[in-house]
Amino acid sequence: KPLVYQLFAERGLRVPEHRTYQLDDWKQAAEFLKSHPKGCVVKPANGTSSGQGVTTHILTDSEVKTASILASLYCSDLLIEPMIPGECYRLLVLDGELVHAVRRTGPRLVGDGVSTIASLLQVDNEFRRSRGEQPLDADRDCLFTLDYQGLSLESVPLQGQTVLVKSVNDPRRKCVEVRTVYNDVVTHLICDSLRHNAEAAAKILNSRLVGVDFITVDPTVPLDKSGGVINEVNTTPGLHHHYDAARESFPEPAPRILQSLLSR
Protein backbone atom coordinates (compact mmCIF):
# COMPACT_ATOMS: atom_id res chain seq x y z
CA LYS A 1 0.00 0.00 0.00
CA PRO A 2 2.71 2.61 0.78
CA LEU A 3 4.43 1.94 -2.55
CA VAL A 4 1.17 2.34 -4.46
CA TYR A 5 0.45 5.54 -2.55
CA GLN A 6 3.89 6.85 -3.51
CA LEU A 7 3.45 6.00 -7.19
CA PHE A 8 0.04 7.65 -7.28
CA ALA A 9 1.10 10.76 -5.35
CA GLU A 10 4.09 11.27 -7.65
CA ARG A 11 1.64 11.44 -10.56
CA GLY A 12 -0.79 13.81 -8.88
CA LEU A 13 -3.44 11.37 -7.68
CA ARG A 14 -4.96 12.00 -4.25
CA VAL A 15 -4.14 9.41 -1.59
CA PRO A 16 -4.58 9.51 2.19
CA GLU A 17 -2.03 11.22 4.38
CA HIS A 18 -0.28 8.31 6.07
CA ARG A 19 2.69 7.05 8.04
CA THR A 20 4.37 3.65 7.89
CA TYR A 21 5.88 2.07 10.98
CA GLN A 22 6.49 -1.22 12.76
CA LEU A 23 5.08 -2.52 16.00
CA ASP A 24 8.11 -1.50 18.08
CA ASP A 25 7.58 2.07 16.86
CA TRP A 26 3.85 2.28 17.55
CA LYS A 27 4.38 5.55 19.44
CA GLN A 28 5.15 7.18 16.07
CA ALA A 29 1.62 6.27 15.06
CA ALA A 30 0.32 7.72 18.32
CA GLU A 31 2.04 11.01 17.40
CA PHE A 32 0.34 10.89 14.00
CA LEU A 33 -3.02 10.46 15.74
CA LYS A 34 -2.54 13.77 17.57
CA SER A 35 -2.81 15.58 14.24
CA HIS A 36 -6.09 13.80 13.45
CA PRO A 37 -8.35 14.09 16.49
CA LYS A 38 -11.42 12.83 14.60
CA GLY A 39 -9.87 9.40 14.35
CA CYS A 40 -7.48 7.19 12.43
CA VAL A 41 -7.36 3.74 10.91
CA VAL A 42 -4.51 1.26 11.39
CA LYS A 43 -3.96 -1.53 8.89
CA PRO A 44 -1.33 -3.96 7.64
CA ALA A 45 0.72 -2.30 4.90
CA ASN A 46 0.67 -5.35 2.66
CA GLY A 47 -0.74 -8.78 2.00
CA THR A 48 -4.32 -8.65 3.30
CA SER A 49 -7.84 -8.11 2.01
CA SER A 50 -11.45 -7.92 3.21
CA GLY A 51 -10.58 -5.80 6.22
CA GLN A 52 -8.19 -8.31 7.82
CA GLY A 53 -6.16 -6.68 10.57
CA VAL A 54 -7.84 -3.30 10.07
CA THR A 55 -9.06 -1.16 12.98
CA THR A 56 -11.07 2.00 12.29
CA HIS A 57 -12.06 5.06 14.36
CA ILE A 58 -9.03 4.96 16.64
CA LEU A 59 -9.05 7.85 19.13
CA THR A 60 -6.52 7.06 21.88
CA ASP A 61 -2.88 6.01 22.22
CA SER A 62 -3.87 2.71 23.82
CA GLU A 63 -6.14 1.97 20.89
CA VAL A 64 -3.26 2.70 18.52
CA LYS A 65 -1.14 0.13 20.37
CA THR A 66 -3.88 -2.51 20.37
CA ALA A 67 -4.65 -1.93 16.69
CA SER A 68 -0.95 -2.13 15.85
CA ILE A 69 -0.65 -5.49 17.60
CA LEU A 70 -3.60 -6.81 15.60
CA ALA A 71 -2.27 -5.50 12.29
CA SER A 72 1.20 -6.91 13.01
CA LEU A 73 -0.27 -10.42 13.01
CA TYR A 74 -0.72 -10.02 9.26
CA CYS A 75 2.30 -7.92 8.27
CA SER A 76 5.36 -6.49 10.02
CA ASP A 77 4.95 -3.19 8.16
CA LEU A 78 2.02 -1.15 9.42
CA LEU A 79 0.13 1.87 8.15
CA ILE A 80 -1.85 4.59 9.92
CA GLU A 81 -4.15 7.00 8.09
CA PRO A 82 -6.82 9.51 9.11
CA MET A 83 -10.45 8.48 8.76
CA ILE A 84 -11.74 9.82 5.44
CA PRO A 85 -15.33 11.09 5.24
CA GLY A 86 -17.55 9.35 2.73
CA GLU A 87 -18.65 6.05 1.30
CA CYS A 88 -16.53 3.60 -0.65
CA TYR A 89 -16.75 3.31 -4.43
CA ARG A 90 -15.22 0.55 -6.54
CA LEU A 91 -14.36 1.65 -10.09
CA LEU A 92 -13.56 -1.28 -12.37
CA VAL A 93 -11.12 -0.52 -15.17
CA LEU A 94 -10.59 -2.90 -18.10
CA ASP A 95 -7.93 -2.27 -20.75
CA GLY A 96 -7.58 1.35 -19.68
CA GLU A 97 -11.31 2.15 -19.66
CA LEU A 98 -13.80 2.45 -16.82
CA VAL A 99 -16.48 -0.19 -17.40
CA HIS A 100 -18.46 -0.26 -14.15
CA ALA A 101 -18.75 1.46 -10.78
CA VAL A 102 -20.46 0.35 -7.59
CA ARG A 103 -20.94 1.87 -4.15
CA ARG A 104 -20.97 0.39 -0.68
CA THR A 105 -24.08 2.30 0.35
CA GLY A 106 -24.40 3.03 4.05
CA PRO A 107 -27.75 3.02 5.88
CA ARG A 108 -29.79 6.19 5.70
CA LEU A 109 -32.66 7.74 7.62
CA VAL A 110 -35.29 10.14 6.32
CA GLY A 111 -36.23 13.13 8.43
CA ASP A 112 -39.79 14.11 9.35
CA GLY A 113 -39.01 17.68 10.40
CA VAL A 114 -39.80 16.91 14.06
CA SER A 115 -37.75 13.97 15.32
CA THR A 116 -34.08 14.00 16.25
CA ILE A 117 -31.71 11.62 14.52
CA ALA A 118 -31.50 9.65 17.78
CA SER A 119 -35.28 9.18 17.72
CA LEU A 120 -35.30 8.26 14.04
CA LEU A 121 -32.56 5.73 14.73
CA GLN A 122 -34.58 4.20 17.56
CA VAL A 123 -37.65 3.79 15.34
CA ASP A 124 -35.54 2.32 12.55
CA ASN A 125 -33.95 -0.16 14.95
CA GLU A 126 -37.36 -1.30 16.20
CA PHE A 127 -38.32 -2.01 12.60
CA ARG A 128 -35.05 -3.85 12.01
CA ARG A 129 -35.55 -6.02 15.10
CA SER A 130 -39.08 -6.89 13.99
CA ARG A 131 -37.55 -8.29 10.81
CA GLY A 132 -34.74 -10.11 12.60
CA GLU A 133 -32.13 -7.67 11.28
CA GLN A 134 -29.08 -6.26 13.07
CA PRO A 135 -29.88 -2.88 14.69
CA LEU A 136 -27.67 0.12 14.04
CA ASP A 137 -25.50 1.30 16.92
CA ALA A 138 -24.90 4.97 17.65
CA ASP A 139 -21.20 4.15 17.75
CA ARG A 140 -18.07 6.03 16.68
CA ASP A 141 -18.75 5.40 13.02
CA CYS A 142 -22.25 6.81 13.37
CA LEU A 143 -21.00 9.91 15.21
CA PHE A 144 -18.16 10.42 12.70
CA THR A 145 -20.54 10.02 9.76
CA LEU A 146 -23.00 12.52 11.20
CA ASP A 147 -20.21 14.95 12.10
CA TYR A 148 -18.87 15.31 8.56
CA GLN A 149 -22.41 16.14 7.45
CA GLY A 150 -22.59 18.86 10.11
CA LEU A 151 -25.03 16.84 12.20
CA SER A 152 -25.28 15.08 15.56
CA LEU A 153 -27.70 12.68 17.23
CA GLU A 154 -29.64 15.69 18.51
CA SER A 155 -30.06 17.25 15.07
CA VAL A 156 -33.57 17.41 13.59
CA PRO A 157 -33.45 16.75 9.83
CA LEU A 158 -35.93 18.51 7.60
CA GLN A 159 -38.94 16.60 6.36
CA GLY A 160 -37.80 14.37 3.52
CA GLN A 161 -34.10 15.04 4.19
CA THR A 162 -31.99 11.91 3.79
CA VAL A 163 -29.21 11.43 6.34
CA LEU A 164 -26.37 8.93 6.06
CA VAL A 165 -25.85 7.35 9.49
CA LYS A 166 -23.06 4.81 8.84
CA SER A 167 -20.02 4.79 6.56
CA VAL A 168 -18.36 1.52 7.65
CA ASN A 169 -20.03 -1.84 8.19
CA ASP A 170 -20.63 -3.02 11.75
CA PRO A 171 -17.56 -5.18 12.53
CA ARG A 172 -19.70 -7.50 14.67
CA ARG A 173 -21.33 -8.76 11.50
CA LYS A 174 -18.55 -11.19 10.71
CA CYS A 175 -20.13 -12.23 7.42
CA VAL A 176 -19.71 -8.70 6.06
CA GLU A 177 -16.46 -7.33 4.67
CA VAL A 178 -15.48 -3.92 6.00
CA ARG A 179 -16.08 -1.23 3.37
CA THR A 180 -16.16 -3.82 0.58
CA VAL A 181 -19.75 -4.96 0.21
CA TYR A 182 -20.91 -2.97 -2.78
CA ASN A 183 -24.65 -2.88 -3.33
CA ASP A 184 -25.48 -0.01 -5.71
CA VAL A 185 -24.49 0.50 -9.33
CA VAL A 186 -23.33 4.11 -9.68
CA THR A 187 -21.51 4.18 -13.01
CA HIS A 188 -23.79 7.01 -14.12
CA LEU A 189 -22.75 9.16 -11.13
CA ILE A 190 -19.00 9.04 -11.68
CA CYS A 191 -17.61 12.37 -12.86
CA ASP A 192 -14.98 12.62 -15.58
CA SER A 193 -12.31 13.48 -13.01
CA LEU A 194 -12.83 10.27 -10.99
CA ARG A 195 -13.03 8.28 -14.20
CA HIS A 196 -9.69 9.70 -15.33
CA ASN A 197 -8.20 9.05 -11.87
CA ALA A 198 -9.21 5.39 -12.01
CA GLU A 199 -7.93 4.93 -15.54
CA ALA A 200 -4.66 6.68 -14.63
CA ALA A 201 -4.25 4.37 -11.62
CA ALA A 202 -4.62 1.32 -13.86
CA LYS A 203 -2.06 2.73 -16.28
CA ILE A 204 0.44 3.47 -13.51
CA LEU A 205 0.19 -0.14 -12.32
CA ASN A 206 0.25 -1.47 -15.88
CA SER A 207 -2.80 -3.60 -15.07
CA ARG A 208 -5.38 -4.64 -17.66
CA LEU A 209 -8.06 -5.29 -15.03
CA VAL A 210 -8.10 -3.39 -11.75
CA GLY A 211 -10.59 -2.29 -9.13
CA VAL A 212 -9.81 1.20 -7.85
CA ASP A 213 -11.40 2.03 -4.49
CA PHE A 214 -12.30 5.63 -3.73
CA ILE A 215 -13.66 7.13 -0.53
CA THR A 216 -15.65 10.28 -1.18
CA VAL A 217 -18.78 12.08 -0.03
CA ASP A 218 -19.70 12.92 -3.63
CA PRO A 219 -18.61 10.99 -6.75
CA THR A 220 -19.96 13.70 -9.03
CA VAL A 221 -17.14 16.13 -8.19
CA PRO A 222 -13.31 15.84 -8.27
CA LEU A 223 -11.52 14.53 -5.19
CA ASP A 224 -9.89 17.88 -4.44
CA LYS A 225 -13.38 19.36 -4.03
CA SER A 226 -14.90 16.51 -2.00
CA GLY A 227 -11.84 15.78 0.14
CA GLY A 228 -11.88 12.21 -1.10
CA VAL A 229 -8.97 9.88 -1.88
CA ILE A 230 -8.00 6.74 -3.70
CA ASN A 231 -8.00 4.32 -0.79
CA GLU A 232 -6.85 1.09 -2.40
CA VAL A 233 -6.36 -0.79 -5.66
CA ASN A 234 -7.14 -4.42 -6.37
CA THR A 235 -5.42 -6.12 -9.29
CA THR A 236 -7.57 -9.24 -8.83
CA PRO A 237 -10.97 -7.56 -8.36
CA GLY A 238 -13.93 -9.78 -7.52
CA LEU A 239 -16.78 -9.65 -10.02
CA HIS A 240 -19.21 -10.59 -7.26
CA HIS A 241 -19.14 -6.94 -6.24
CA HIS A 242 -20.77 -6.13 -9.57
CA TYR A 243 -23.52 -8.75 -9.35
CA ASP A 244 -26.84 -8.20 -7.59
CA ALA A 245 -27.98 -11.63 -6.41
CA ALA A 246 -31.21 -10.20 -4.98
CA ARG A 247 -32.33 -9.02 -8.40
CA GLU A 248 -30.61 -11.83 -10.33
CA SER A 249 -29.09 -9.21 -12.59
CA PHE A 250 -25.97 -10.19 -14.49
CA PRO A 251 -22.77 -8.24 -13.89
CA GLU A 252 -22.37 -5.77 -16.71
CA PRO A 253 -18.57 -6.02 -16.94
CA ALA A 254 -18.51 -9.83 -17.28
CA PRO A 255 -19.26 -9.93 -21.04
CA ARG A 256 -16.70 -7.18 -21.61
CA ILE A 257 -14.04 -9.12 -19.75
CA LEU A 258 -14.83 -12.37 -21.56
CA GLN A 259 -14.77 -10.60 -24.91
CA SER A 260 -11.41 -9.04 -24.08
CA LEU A 261 -9.96 -12.40 -23.03
CA LEU A 262 -11.30 -14.38 -25.98
CA SER A 263 -10.31 -11.82 -28.58
CA ARG A 264 -6.61 -12.03 -27.75
PLM feature segments, named:
Residues 3-7, 41-44, 171-176, 188, ...:
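Short amphipathic alpha-helical segments, especially helix-boundary/capping motifs
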Residues 86-88, 95-99, 207-209, 223, ...:
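Coil-to-beta-strand transition motifs
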